[in-house]
Regions:
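Extended, helix-rich architectural segments
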Residues: 1-141
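Glycine- and charge-rich intrinsically disordered segments
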Residues: 1-6, 233-245, 249-252, 256, ...
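Short amphipathic alpha-helical segments
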Residues: 93, 97, 106-114, 121, ...
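Extended, regular secondary-structure scaffolds
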Residues: 128-222
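Extended hydrophobic-aromatic, low-complexity segments
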Residues: 18, 22, 28, 32, ...
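Extended, charged amphipathic alpha-helical segments
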Residues: 202-333
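C-terminal helix-loop subdomains that flank or include functional centers
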Residues: 266-268, 279, 306-446
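Short, charged/polar micro-motifs that form catalytic or ligand-binding hotspots
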Residues: 119, 290-301, 342-349, 401
């Protein structure tokens, strides 16, 4: 099998670079074009601009329906909703550090940023986040389009990030297209203009992250998008549905075959058979009938059903339109239906957690400089919670049966409609206190 340049560019590993030259940056940008095209194609599928939209018909008189189906968006949104529909929470024995981390994350809209990262990774196979300090000296992080980033790792077993390149187009008021390039290293950030295949340095600034301020979030070991392996099946389904639509339109505009008589227009002129969709044969057998294509509807629908099932099966996303996926399933049955999604999401969680810990490490590095402290990023623990459909009645009955057997905190944590167990316990305690006060007041009045 031929090894494509794009496969290498999904994760670039080079020997340690003492000097990052302009020639190296330009070469990496040039070699990144195939990988950039792959990502942009996947993003077009997410927007339901599938390849079927590019199909042409040589005969303009034949129908050319171009029906695309949003499987790509469905697959990505299903996984992201299941994976991060409930925001990640954090816990730590170091409450002071946890408070600083939470404040930083709130300032950066971390919940929304995580969703963006998860969607980007689901589509492209990986996502990138850039860390920086804003004009108010606040620590910031933001997801970046993966097609605009080149991250270079060393070729050791640890695969550490050596440097990263972000390149993107900007447009001047004179409609002149200019490409800007930003280089991120362990010590500084360098800004360039990129024009006529040449880099011109504009400025550079130091940073205080003690590492390259870029975080990599992999979707899986192969850095594949969630629907990338089933693109050919999506294309086949689009083609089958489009061809079916064409066939029905052909049937609606079927040709009338007239035999045994020479047809003329009302003014005795030759009839325009093409415009009138008529075939005329001057043989001895007089008859008139429509010429239609014999469609094996049953076989065609079975074929499309198989494609639909295979798309769900090989992307591991649950088919919510399955008649067996009803609202009365038990918790065990729901988990069984979601087994495939859970396998994939388990990998997603492991990879995403690795990225989160690098983000936290970079945040803590800056906090330690600001506070002159030596806090450990490993004291922060991310907690993931699946956003799965539940049988609330079943869970409530189980929780009722555990009252008095396990702690109230454990019972409340089982209920999907209780978001903050600690706050709920405080409300319950306050209600009990008010009830007791009212009882005592009533007794005194008697």
């Amino acid at each position: 099998m031929e090894y494509r340049k794009g496969d290498i560019m999904r994760k670039i590993k080079l020997p340690m670079q003492e000097n990052i030259t302009n020639d190296l940056i330009v070469k990496l940008i040039e070699n990144h074009s195939e990988e950039k095209s792959r990502i942009l194609k996947l993003k077009e599928y997410y927007k339901n601009n599938n390849s079927i939209k590019e199909r042409t018909q040589t005969d303009i008189n034949k129908p050319n329906n171009l029906l695309s189906h949003g499987y790509a968006r469905y697959i990505t949104d299903s996984f992201c909703g299941y994976f991060l529909g409930r925001p990640i929470t954090y816990k730590s024995v170091n409450e002071a550090l946890l408070e600083q981390i939470n404040n930083c994350f709130i300032y950066n809209d971390e919940v929304g940023n995580n969703i963006t990262l998860a969607q980007e990774a689901s589509i492209s196979g990986y996502a990138y986040e850039v860390m920086y300090i804003d004009e108010d000296s606040n620590l910031r992080f933001k997801a970046i389009n993966s097609e605009d980033m080149i991250v270079v790792y060393d070729n050791t077993i640890e695969e550490k990030i050596q440097f990263a390149i972000r390149y993107y187009d900007i447009y001047s008021l004179e409609d002149e297209e200019i490409k800007e390039v930003v280089l991120y290293t362990k010590n500084e950030i360098v800004y360039y203009d990129f024009k006529d295949e040449a880099l011109t340095e504009k400025s550079r600034e130091a940073h205080y992250f003690n590492d390259v301020p870029v975080v990599d979030y992999e979707n899986n070991n192969n850095r594949l998008g969630d629907y990338e392996p089933v693109i050919s099946l999506i294309d086949a389904y689009d083609k089958a549905q489009s061809d079916t639509s064409n066939d029905f339109e052909y049937f609606t505009n079927a040709l009338l075959v007239v035999s045994g008589v020479v047809m003329e227009s009302e003014d005795n002129q030759p009839l325009n058979f093409k415009d009138n969709r008529v075939l005329n044969f001057a043989d001895t057998n007089s008859k008139a009938e429509y010429l239609i294509k014999n469609i094996n509807d049953s076989a065609l629908e079975n074929y499309k059903d198989r494609l639909n099932n295979d798309i769900h099966r090989f992307s591991n996303v649950v088919n919510m339109s399955d008649e067996n996926f009803g609202g009365n399933l038990t918790g065990i049955a729901i988990k069984h239906k979601l087994t495939g999604m859970e396998y994939v999401t388990g990998i997603k969680e492991t990879k995403f957690k690795k990225g989160l810990m690098r983000r936290i490490e970079l945040v803590v590095a800056v906090l330690n400089i600001k506070t002159n402290d030596l806090m450990l990023y490993t004291e922060i623990k991310p907690v993931f919670t699946r956003n799965m459909p539940t049988n609330d009645e079943e869970i409530t009955n189980i929780a009722k049966g555990l009252v008095g057997i396990v702690s109230d905190q454990t019972v409340l944590s089982m209920l999907p409609y209780v978001d903050d167990v600690t706050a709920e316990l405080e409300v319950i305690a306050k209600e009990k206190e008010n009830t007791l006060d009212n009882y005592n007041l009533g007794a005194l009045n008697e």
